[in-house]
């Protein structure tokens, strides 16, 4: 899903309680609307596993500052 210019979140079908369907902006108090590090409109805590490790690589973990799940080597 690609956001259009001026949108904070994808506000189309299905409805998302974190995203205002009229403005495509986050609802008051929401930090995020979706993503591996978003839970109930809030960023998951720093260190929360968002992607299980494969092979010799460590688990990917949330930063607590974003809804994205960075790859271990992006930190």
From Swiss-Prot:
Its main location: secreted. GO terms for molecular function: toxin activity. Gene3D superfamilies: Disintegrin domain. Residues 1-75 form the Disintegrin domain. The keyword Manganese does not apply. Disulfide bonds join 9-24, 11-19, 18-41, 32-38, 37-62, 50-69. Monomer (disintegrin). This is Disintegrin CTF-II.
């Amino acid at each position: 899903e690609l956001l259009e210019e001026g949108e904070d979140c994808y506000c189309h079908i299905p409805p998302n309680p974190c995203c205002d369907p009229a403005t495509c902006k986050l609802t008051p108090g929401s930090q995020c609307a979706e993503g591996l590090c978003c839970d109930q409109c809030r960023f998951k805590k720093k260190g929360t596993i968002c992607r299980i490790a494969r092979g010799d690589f460590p688990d990917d973990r949330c930063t607590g500052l974003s809804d994205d799940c960075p790859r271990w080597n992006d930190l």
